[in-house]
């Protein structure tokens, strides 16, 4: 893919994000910032489309979140100038684990724990 093609894709994404926000009355966006590549790209796109002052991010950590992920997420926010906050969702995950253990009579397995974390992050962002 050429630079020109990549720029065209980027500009289309930027225009569509701005248009979607305008059409739905959203002046600001809230996104999850994990310290990974996907959320880094989304945050840069949002800043480019809306301006950093309209981008807000949450790093929703659990007991499994590495210090490196926290550092990278903070660096991404600082470099791009958007609002950023770390919140600990582990207490919510722990409550869900206890609830599920009561329902099913055993502790949740690894894949279930991963899904709980992903769903809690999604619920938090949709709230």
Describe the role of every protein-language-model region:
Residues 54, 59, 67-112, 116-118:
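A conserved beta-strand->alpha-helix junction
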Residues 2-9, 65, 112-117:
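Conserved acidic
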Residues 27-33, 37-74:
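ATP-dependent adenylation/pyrophosphate-handling site
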Residues 12, 40-42, 91-95:
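Short, functional N-terminal and low-complexity linear motifs
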Residues 1-32, 48-49:
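RNA-binding accessory domains that recognize and position tRNA/RNA substrates
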């Amino acid at each position: 893919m050429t630079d020109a093609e990549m720029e065209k894709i980027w500009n289309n994404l930027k225009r569509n994000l701005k248009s979607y926000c305008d059409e739905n009355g959203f002046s600001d966006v809230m996104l999850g910032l994990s310290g990974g590549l996907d959320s880094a790209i989304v945050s840069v796109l949002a800043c480019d489309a809306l301006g950093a002052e309209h981008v807000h991010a949450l790093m929703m950590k659990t007991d499994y979140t590495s210090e490196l992920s926290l550092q990278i997420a903070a660096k991404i926010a600082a470099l791009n100038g958007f609002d950023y906050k770390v919140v600990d969702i582990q207490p919510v995950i722990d409550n869900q684990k206890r609830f599920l253990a009561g329902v099913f009579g055993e502790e949740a397995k690894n894949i279930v724990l991963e899904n709980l974390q992903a769903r809690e992050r999604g619920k938090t962002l949709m709230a």
